[in-house]
Amino acid sequence: MVCLDLSQYRMITDVKNKDNTLILEINKIYEIEVEIPYEEVEIDGSIIKINAHPKRAENIKVGILNLISYSIANNLKSKITKRKTIYINEPIPLIGHTAFGLIERGRNIIQVRGHCGCNLNCIFCSVDEGEFSKTRKNDYYVDLEYLIENYKKIVDFKENKFIEAHLDGQGEPSLYYPLVDLVQELAEINKKGNGIVSMQTNGTVLNYKLIDELEEAGLHRINLSINALDEKMAKMLSGRRDYNIKKILDIAEYIKNSKIHLLIAPLLLPNINDEEFKRVIEYAVDLEQKNPQNIINPLTGKKDPILGCQLCRVYQLGRRPKKMKVWDFEKFYYLLGKYELEYKKKGIEVKLITSPKDFGTHKRKRLPYPFKVGEVTKVKVVLDGRVKGEVLGVAKDRVIQIINCNNEQNLIGKTVKVRILRNKDNIIVAELV
């Protein structure tokens, strides 16, 4: 008898079965079903027992692993968003798309997007994320080793000095698995040049154990989204009845007592959460007064601000709450300046109007642009897109978003001519010619 122990594979995080169908949890938040077509197989938890002649048993073992690999490549589904998830690995480039991979904007900060998909359904989401999205048709997950390999290439290109890896994306970054390994790998690379790793999060996935592990892995800062303290308002903004603001505040205080810098990032939705926005600011200031952190950002030689106030903007495929008023940044900064003055009169110095320089962000060598806007080029279509009417093509070590397509599935595998519409920050958008 030959045994196949599925628990030895890191990406397989849970195993169930229904008769001869394996139901595998992949990287915590994904799932596949694999029908095992062999009579000689007995499934016992994560152990598959193969009762056959040794040579036949080894062939069956290889066959089962091939079926699992095929299912991950073609039938992966998110348990969070219920969408098909495309597993990204070599040879798909990781530069060119906003939904996954790496984004480099000619600065010392590199945005790391290991996956997309969110466990909340925020009413203001700029990318229409969550289970009830009306525009997103596919999610993506990037293989950890492939992500790190490509990240290191960009860091080396920038000569590895004062680099910040920032985990963000179209979704909740902390849902990526293995998150701790990702942070540790990034931190190991960046610390050679006095760099850091930071992460955006809505906080819902975090717990004491995970925070301890992220601290040990070398995470420098958590940008924690808190948009209201009122329980009813917080649930409404998040689009989830089970959103627990008390749990988020408890997590905030736990982070504050760790070696990870806490930055609270409230979002103002004018005419919706104006009062709650101010309350979140007050909460953050009080927390800093009671428990000041002394964590120094090596990029600046100073402490990071406690607050990163943001203004809700309207985006083409994003959500816009009906009652929300649209403000420009001049009006927003005027409001923040007013709040700063109020604190100054109380003898409290609070920085609410922040800039990238406050976090050590500065210009650095930019990756070359392989395409010019208006250029016509040939592209190999390799994957279905993130939204309806989009497919993904590959050319010159870039992934290209080809928009306004019909019959997307018929294009996959073909070489097509496209016209480049956008190349800013190496985010490449094109249309068929």
From Swiss-Prot:
Q: Which residues form a coiled coil?
A: none
Positions that bind [4Fe-4S] cluster: C118, C122, C125
Disulfide-bond pairs as recorded: none
Cofactor binding: number and manner: Binds 1 [4Fe-4S] cluster. The cluster is coordinated with 3 cysteines and an exchangeable S-adenosyl-L-methionine.
Single GO molecular function? metal ion binding
List residues of the TRAM domain: 370-433
Listed binding positions for S-adenosyl-L-methionine are G171, E172, M236, L237, S238
Q: Which residues form the Radical SAM core domain?
A: 104-349
Superkingdom of the organism of origin: Archaea
Q: Which UniProt keywords apply?
A: 4Fe-4S, Iron, Iron-sulfur, Metal-binding, S-adenosyl-L-methionine
List the InterPro entries hit by this protein, alphabetically: Aldolase_TIM, Elp3/MiaA/NifB-like_rSAM, MJ0103-like, rSAM, TRAM_dom
Q: Which cofactor does it need?
A: [4Fe-4S] cluster
Q: Which family does it belong to?
A: Belongs to the radical SAM superfamily.
Q: What is this protein called?
A: Uncharacterized protein MJ0103
- Organism (species): Methanocaldococcus jannaschii (strain ATCC 43067 / DSM 2661 / JAL-1 / JCM 10045 / NBRC 100440) (Methanococcus jannaschii)
